[in-house]
């Protein structure tokens, strides 16, 4: 838990394929992975919540526990209604070089790049997705969104004209509305060298 919390509100995840650990915020008191059931299940204890069902003759002032079915649907559905499960993925910074020899395409950041368009390659897209191109002139600077972004992508979007320019570019794909889900394919940009300053 965070230092000001008395309940579990953080999680750690290990990616076996890449050998990488990540941390995140996730309020869960207990968790059981898929195996006995088709999906993982978890509980979350909320100390200031009243249970949704009454207990005859007892006033519960100790809070309530919620049961979650993970990896099931695209939204969070409970007694309070349906809310979106916001998610995003962001690439690392990448740069380009003006070298044409395939053996020397190391992306050394010598040149600025002009990103004319983003070409969506969603294998699955339910609802919309938001694309943000972050551009940066130097590694120690704070990356900013391209002037025209963020961009909304639908299942009928062929391309997005971006007019982004920077030495370093990273891409964020996000969803923040109910009923949205996506699976992305290959990153596709129309980019070219655009000078040294």
Predicted feature descriptions by range:
Residues 1-197:
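Beta-sheet repeat architectures centered on beta-propellers
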């Amino acid at each position: 838990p965070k230092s000001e919390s008395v309940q579990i509100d953080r999680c750690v995840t290990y990616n076996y394929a890449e050998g990488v650990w990540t941390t995140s915020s996730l309020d869960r008191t207990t968790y059981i992975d898929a195996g006995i059931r088709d999906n993982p299940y978890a509980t979350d204890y909320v100390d200031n919540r009243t249970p949704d069902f009454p207990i005859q003759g007892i006033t519960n002032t100790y809070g309530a526990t919620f049961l979650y079915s993970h990896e099931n649907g695209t939204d969070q559905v409970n007694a309070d209604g349906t809310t979106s499960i916001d998610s995003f993925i962001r690439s690392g910074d990448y740069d380009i070089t003006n070298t044409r020899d395939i053996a020397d395409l190391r992306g050394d950041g010598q040149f600025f790049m002009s990103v004319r368009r983003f070409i969506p390659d969603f294998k699955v897209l339910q609802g919309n997705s938001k694309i943000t191109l972050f551009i940066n002139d130097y590694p120690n600077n704070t990356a900013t969104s391209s002037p025209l972004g963020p961009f909304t992508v639908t299942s009928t979007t062929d391309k997005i004209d971006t007019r982004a320019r920077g030495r370093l570019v990273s891409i964020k794909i996000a969803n923040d509305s109910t009923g949205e889900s996506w699976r992305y394919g290959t990153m596709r940009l129309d980019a070219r060298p655009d000078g040294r300053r």
